[in-house]
Amino acid sequence: ILDHNKNPRNFGALECATCSREGYNPLCGDHLHIHLRLVEGRIEGISFEGSGCAISKASASLMTATLKGKEVADAERLFEDFHSMVMADVAEPVDDAKLGKMAIFAGVREFPMRVKCATLAWHAMKSAISGDQAPVSTE
């Protein structure tokens, strides 16, 4: 998490983006823009811009690295898996095979106020690929 916060992957504007969405977490002050280039149902490019806490930046960085090259349907499934993981009971085991490196965020569920930080980029990504026009807010 610290590495992705200090050296975020896919940070910056995305040339030729086909959709973008803004996300804001007023409780923590996280403010992100997710940019995607979708080609024939595949995420050909994905990046993010903005500022926020270490958890939101690291989550956005890992999300973009994980989703680049994936089918949109796979991205939607990963969103559901990630969201279920961070919302699950602390004692519930984590399926590392499904989530890969994103499983490092399992500990966030012990801190309910931080769940919104971890999921902000994911909600913005899901909103962008579904075509919603409104900015995403965690409130």
Regions found by a protein language model. Name each.
Residues 1-15, 70-139:
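C-terminal binding/interaction regions
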Residues 7, 11-46, 50:
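Structured beta-strand/loop patches that form or line metal/cofactor-binding pockets in enzymes
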Residues 28, 55, 110-114:
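Secondary-structure capping and boundary motifs in well-ordered enzyme cores
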Residues 32, 61, 116, 120:
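Active-site phosphate/pyrophosphate-handling residues
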Residues 50-57:
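Short, thiol/selenol-centered motifs that function as redox-active sites or metal-ligating centers
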Residues 57-58, 77:
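Alpha-helical macromolecular-interaction surfaces
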Residues 59-71:
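Alpha-helical support elements that line or immediately flank enzyme active sites
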